[in-house]
Amino acid sequence: GSEKEADMGPLVTRAHRDRIAGLIDSGEAAGAKVVIDGRTVEARGAADGFWLGPTLFDNVTPDMEIYTEEIFGPVLSVVRVSSYAEGVELINANAYGNGTAVFTNDGGAARRFEKDVQVGMIGVNVPVPVPVAYYSFGGWKRSLFGDTHAHGTEGVHFFTRGKVVTTRWIDPANRPTDGLQLGFPRNV
């Protein structure tokens, strides 16, 4: 956190940190390869913070808890598949639909991936597909909390109360002589 070169701060609560650390333990126990282990990170001068460094798993399988649970922490899992179709099927079969990423040099394959997967955020050659704030942030399926996304036009609409004002101003020089007219304007 507080250092200029830091990319990430502490987690919000001890319970959340402990939950994520438990999921990392679970992934390791289930046989996933821990490539980078964030459980050993310490913050100088902030030992009481809820720190957990980035963790990268390889060889994750769909039956592992680190795949079936939505972690919401600094953990990435590499799940290997043997074909494009198998990868899309794996993504679409997941109960969550927050985000996914593909790495490719083939623009056509990237466009096909964008259309084929059922998730709310897609990264192409980007590991964590979190858009800037004026775009929608949020997933599909069980990854969506409530009925709107946090940012973008849906977020603006959620935090804004719309108002419609309908007015009609009559030119005093053209005021009707037969009384007040409350109906729709007519072209005469």
What are these regions (language model features)?
Residues P10-A21:
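Short beta-strand to alpha-helix junction loop
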Residues M8, I24, A29, R44-V188:
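Conserved C-terminal structural/oligomerization subdomain of aldehyde/semialdehyde dehydrogenase
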Residues S2-G9:
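Short linear capping/connector segments at secondary-structure termini
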Residues G31-T40:
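Short secondary-structure junctions
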